[in-house]
Regions:
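Conserved C-terminal helix/tail region of periplasmic/extracytoplasmic solute-binding proteins
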Residues: 101-132
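Short secondary-structure boundary/hinge segments and terminal tails
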Residues: 17-18, 79-80, 116-120
Length: 132
């Protein structure tokens, strides 16, 4: 707003939710499976801590990162960490790949499922891996 921007709507208001995925090579996964599982568990624990202590976390991060605490809290409402790997997430990636191929972002069409490795997620959150 200070630069002249005016917020028209939030991502929540228009139903946009972004997803993110952790990427690695098969070699790194096979050599560091337990460490990566602990990493996923730590991300989940950190997310829960922030959810349970949002005001305190926002103030801390505002101080450390130069953010406004209220901006962090507003953005955090759009964040969710769902550990594991769901069929829904797989379908989302397939939709992205299809769109990318159809719009010339990818030189060839490929099967997303050939690149998904759930070994780590099955260790860290076995009940949350629902990819078929």
């Amino acid at each position: 707003e200070e630069a002249g921007w005016v917020q028209v709507a939030t991502s929540q208001e228009i139903g946009i939710q972004t997803g993110s995925y952790f990427l690695s090579t098969d070699k790194y996964i096979s050599e560091n499976t337990d460490t990566l599982a602990k990493f996923l568990q730590a991300v989940d624990e950190s997310t829960q801590y922030i959810n349970d202590h949002l005001d305190e976390s926002a103030e801390y991060l505002a101080d450390k990162l130069g953010l406004k605490a209220e901006d962090f809290k507003e953005n955090w409402k759009n964040y969710s960490f769902e550990p594991g790997f769901s069929e829904e997430a797989t379908t989302h990636l397939e939709d992205i790949e299809k769109w990318g191929f159809e719009h010339g972002s990818f030189p060839k069409d490929y099967n997303v499922r050939d690149f998904i490795n759930t070994d780590v997620a099955k260790i860290a959150f076995p009940d949350n891996v629902t990819i078929e």
